[in-house]
């Protein structure tokens, strides 16, 4: 008789554990989106704001537009091409925020792109993680 009671108790414990495992927990983890995309009114562009964690995970780096040989220069890694073949870079008007800007590339020398037209010297641009910014803006790979 005692042997049957042990099996019955074990069965109740296992059934109880199974029932609690199937419960929906009200304290679900909060979903944090790594990027917030806000359309810029009056244009086709969007403002991409990343969380600190997203910047860390992407190992995102920035540099400034500088001048060399009387032309604006950016790292070649800053450039991204859209489906129409237009060339863009991501400027950073404020911390963790990026806005795509059209550029006209004159030529590339090594790891530098010399621009005919683009943002002013001193503008902060993304130099690493550019493809990921583009993907976030257009929800590519999501």
Regions found by a protein language model. Name each.
Residues 12, 27, 78-81:
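Alpha-helical interaction segments
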Residues 3, 22-60, 88-109, 114-142:
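Short alpha-helical boundary/capping segments at helix-coil junctions
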Residues 1-22:
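Sec-dependent bacterial lipoprotein signal peptides
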Residues 68-74, 78-95:
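Mature extracytoplasmic domains of secretory-pathway proteins
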């Amino acid at each position: 008789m005692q042997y049957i009671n042990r099996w019955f108790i074990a069965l109740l414990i296992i059934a109880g554990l199974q029932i609690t495992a199937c419960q929906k927990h009200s304290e679900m983890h909060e979903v944090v989106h790594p990027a917030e995309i806000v359309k810029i009114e009056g244009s086709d562009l969007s403002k991409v704001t990343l969380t600190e964690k997203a910047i860390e995970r992407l190992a995102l780096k920035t540099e400034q537009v500088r001048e060399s040989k009387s032309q604006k220069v950016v790292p070649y890694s800053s450039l991204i091409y859209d489906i129409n073949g237009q060339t863009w870079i991501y400027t950073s008007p404020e911390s963790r925020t990026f806005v795509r800007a059209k550029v006209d590339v004159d030529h590339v020398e090594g790891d530098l792109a010399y621009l005919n037209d683009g943002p002013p010297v001193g503008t902060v641009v993304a130099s690493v993680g550019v493809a990921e910014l583009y993907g976030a803006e257009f929800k590519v790979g999501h």
